[in-house]
Design a protein with these regions (language model features):
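Non-catalytic terminal extensions of PLP-dependent enzymes
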Residues: 42-219
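Mobile "lid/hinge" segments at catalytic clefts and subdomain interfaces of large enzymes
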Residues: 1-63, 67
Length: 219
């Protein structure tokens, strides 16, 4: 539901001066309710409690692993997070030129879909590991994030180029890696296989970096 002041009511979608409904499902999606109902019925009271505990435990595990390098934006009085955590990425822009978008794109080279970007805090990454992730998978993700942190430090320390680097050029699709032209000061190995475990089950993205704003407006 959306609440507005009385003087704005006539401008709501499909009213006197409003625009057409912008949602493809203006009355909602009943399928979402069926999924939620099935999830609750299959888990039961004990299962729901246990899965919630595991989700919170997983999020706090990642926060403990990454807090000293990235920093955690919000924590409770005990220093813990809920079922998700927000990684601080805003300082990197000043020290290396790297943005939260660069980190999200680089994660694709490690085989991970980008986490929630710049929400609810601009310039951050919000990560929600959920209850189903194994310790091994959490450790792999932690390793990826720490390696990306090291890549940022390489830029800060002058080891990597300020603009032509693995972060700002990420992601690296297969056609780029196997192509004849390679105009980067870093190796194809570092671009495509930044960690040993990546090569074991490499997930290739289809395209290189795109203009996010243009894509949101036109695709």
């Amino acid at each position: 539901p959306i609440c507005v002041a009385k003087h704005l009511a006539e401008f709501l979608p499909d009213l006197n001066f409003g625009i057409n409904t912008v949602s493809s499902a203006p009355y909602g999606s009943a399928g979402v309710l069926a999924i939620t109902y099935g999830y609750i019925r299959m888990l039961g009271e004990e299962g729901l409690t246990h899965s919630t505990k595991m989700a919170i435990l997983n999020a706090n595990y990642l926060a403990a692993c990454l807090g000293d390098t990235y920093g955690i934006v919000y924590t409770g009085e005990t220093g813990r997070v809920g079922h998700e955590l927000i990684l601080e990425c805003r300082n990197f822009k000043n020290t290396s030129g790297v943005s939260e978008t660069d980190i999200a794109k680089r994660l694709m080279d490690y085989g991970y879909h980008a986490p929630t970007l710049s929400f609810p805090v601009h310039g951050t990454l919000m990560i929600e590991p959920t209850e189903s992730e194994s310790l091994a998978e959490l450790d792999k993700f932690t390793d990826a994030m720490l390696k990306i942190y090291d890549e940022i430090k390489e830029i800060e320390n002058g080891i990597a180029d300020k603009t032509n680097n693995v972060l700002m050029n990420a992601p690296h699709p297969e056609y780029e890696i196997v192509g004849d032209d390679w105009n980067h000061p870093y190796s194809r190995q570092k671009a495509a296989y930044p960690a040993p475990w990546v090569a074991e089950n490499k997930f290739w993205i289809n395209v290189a970096r795109v203009d996010n704003a243009y894509g949101d407006r036109n695709l």
